Amino acid sequence: MIMKRLTIIDFVEKYTHEYSELTFLREKVDGVWTETSFRATREEAHKIGAGLVALGLKKGEKVSLLSQGRNLWITSELGILYAGGVNVPLSIKLTESTDLLFRIQHSESRYVIVSEQQLSKIRSIIKDCPLVEKIIVLDPINDYQDNEIAISDIIAMGEEYLKEHAAEFQTLYESIGPDDYANISYTSGTTADPKGILLTHRNYTANVEQGASVIHCDKGDVMLIILPLDHCFAHVAGFYTMMSYGGSIATVPIGKTAIATLKNIPIAIKEVKPMLMLSVPALARNFRKSIETSIKAKGKVVERLYEFALNNAIKYNKEYWNRGGWQAWRYPLVKLFDKIIFKAVREGFGGRMKFFVGGGALLDIE
């Protein structure tokens, strides 16, 4: 039997029905962690998608998305895809106006969705983006310009559109095929102009299916995403994989500055107590450095015991899929040191950690 080649839309429809009332999105709002169900996530994505259609977005047209990680980032991307559009996720780390300008122009984006924090970057270049018809702002602001509209207005437009055109909207999103483009992911452009990588719906869903064979989690498990959502790694190993398991994802609360957001990471870890996290090598090295600094502060004996325990665990686990084997004799030591050393390390990550998934670049075995 040949499996159906799923689109992201197929994927979302399947799992939001299967896990309808389970929590999918977690976000801290005014100091309180809020929960959004699979059903509510789909409903908001439908409204945003229908609102974009009402605004004028046509199938295959591009929408740039520039925002910190948050629930509205995810539902905005899903809304773009439901409307038949192509998301162009932009990194908030892009500070040079020319970097943003190139990507928006090169992708031929017709709309830009942006957070209040990033809005000034778009306003500074919008005069040079003649193809952009509207800027959609994710946060309430006091000074909307003529070409700007609130996401709440898009959602309201979507609600009205669906009252009269629900069947047409369904026909639209059901017409999307696995080989239709879902995303244009730009390279960093450090040595030349950035390259726009065209990714199809099936690129994503196939990767999720492959990733699910490696990342094993349970329904209801929680992942804290500390990586930028514009990165493909965060898409695949992050919210689409967790969606397939009936798990939920939490995003780090947005600070007033990038540094403030970074400081929110350890707070979020303690509050969310995630079972899974994603990391790139540079971030993993920072976590390890922080752990080993704490170990060294406890004295030479503890430091040497930690080093012995770590080396023993590395030799036993190897690449994990081939753990044990002729190193199986190390297993009792692995269990012993897990109780007296590594349990404390896990407690620092909330106490429920199952997987710390590395990717995005070459990851050392250590």
How would you describe each model-predicted region?
Residues M3-F24, E43:
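A short N-terminal helical cap/helix-turn-helix that marks the beginning
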Residues S20-T23, V137, S152, A156-Y186, ...:
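Conserved pre-ATP/AMP-binding loop-to-beta segment of ANL
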Residues F24-R70, L78, T95-L101, A150-G158, ...:
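Conserved AMP-binding/adenylate-forming core of the ANL superfamily
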Residues E35-R39, A182-V208:
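Conserved AMP-binding A3 loop
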